Amino acid sequence: MLGILLYCRPGFENDCANELQDKATALEVFGFVKTKRNSGYVFYQCYDPQQVEYLLEKLDYKQLIFARQLIAVKAFINDLPLDDRISPILEITRNLPLGGDLYVETPEGDDTKPLLTFCRKFTVPLRQALRKHNSLTAKENRNKIFYHLCFLDNKSAYIGFSVPHNRSEFYMGIPRLRSPSEAPSRSTLKLDEAIQVFLTAEEQQERLHSGMRAVDLGACPGGWTYQLVRRGLFVTAIDNGAMAQSLMDTGQVTHYTVDGFKYEPERKNIDWLVCDMIEKPKRVAKLMGQWLIDGWCKEAIFNFKLPMKKRYQEASEDIKILTDMFEKEDLQYELQAKQLYHDREEITLHVRLIGNHWGKQLGNG
């Protein structure tokens, strides 16, 4: 084994690398980073090859903010013969455990986008060859490792694997979503992606369903509200701006022209709080934390707008504000933070209080 490969948003390689380096150092797995600006990936080569699988086991994909995918790299080939790329790959994968599927990919970098067509065409013959050599299951099996072949050019590629329950299930780590024509803004895709990334299909059925109540802070014109309405929730939209009339016509939306930082709900039994306000992240962190601590909501999805520099440092500080608030109140919580595909200079968080109680108002709503 060589090291760990992460995909990330182009331009955020340093943030992704700093995060990975911090976590590897904390685990006493030492190595060095290989990447370049706008490449869309980070490779961490371990000094001790025996520690790669240990690092993979200890890293939690859900807790990596800037990573789109988490891959353990078996080998790097930079001289694949153009007339027979498959044979060298089969030689490497025969020493890997049985795989459940294959992703032939390329990072979302400026230099590699032209390779996507080749990757798709190469997938079928390589998958057939792997199955013929009993390296892949006859049908896709998501409980097995997935093989990843990450091309940097037409003859150079990382070869490795991801493990079940500790990876993105999406090709290239990117969910393919279509912007609904009736949505008031393209920001709707951010919440749609967040829901799919943070909650399983079963969790969505249990905790995000018709009849529930939500509050959308900074709702105008309604991109995030739309995602809640289409799932059958009743939404209180908070914004000094105007909401799309199409949403108001559903009868599921109540709009108040109030500052999101000053609004207090009359009913304290809100299932979901969502927030995409353009505001300093530390201020948003304190607001979200207080809503949860006071029992005004059960779960929240919200964004932190990041600065142009030291984004990993800023994100870490903002998340610590939240965790410190919860720990001071002795509250148990689940927290995930991800830079989603549809995020720009921002990250999206999901927070849920758990245990026998949530917030101060349980039973009083």
Swiss-Prot record:
Main location: cytoplasm
Catalysed conversion reaction: cytidine(2498) in 23S rRNA + S-adenosyl-L-methionine = 2'-O-methylcytidine(2498) in 23S rRNA + S-adenosyl-L-homocysteine + H(+)
Annotated signal peptide: none
GO MF entry, a single one: S-adenosylmethionine-dependent methyltransferase activity
Alphabetically ordered keywords of this record: Cytoplasm, Methyltransferase, rRNA processing, S-adenosyl-L-methionine, Transferase
Coiled-coil region list: none
Enzyme class: transferase
GO cellular component: cytoplasm
Record's keyword annotation contains NADP: no
Cross-referenced Pfam families: FtsJ, RlmM_FDX, RLMM_N
Active site: 305
Subcellular location: Cytoplasm
Binding site for S-adenosyl-L-methionine: 187, 220-223, 239, 259, 276
InterPro entries with a match to the protein in the record: RlmM_FDX, RlmM_THUMP-like, RNA_MeTrfase_FtsJ_dom, rRNA_MeTrfase_M, SAM-dependent_MTases_sf
Enzyme Commission code: 2.1.1.186
GO BP annotations listed: methylation; rRNA processing
Keyword Methyltransferase in annotation: yes
Family: Belongs to the class I-like SAM-binding methyltransferase superfamily. RNA methyltransferase RlmE family. RlmM subfamily.
Summary of subunit composition and partner proteins: Monomer.
Function, as annotated: Catalyzes the 2'-O-methylation at nucleotide C2498 in 23S rRNA.
Protein name: Ribosomal RNA large subunit methyltransferase M
Lineage: Bacteria, Pseudomonadati, Pseudomonadota, Gammaproteobacteria, Alteromonadales
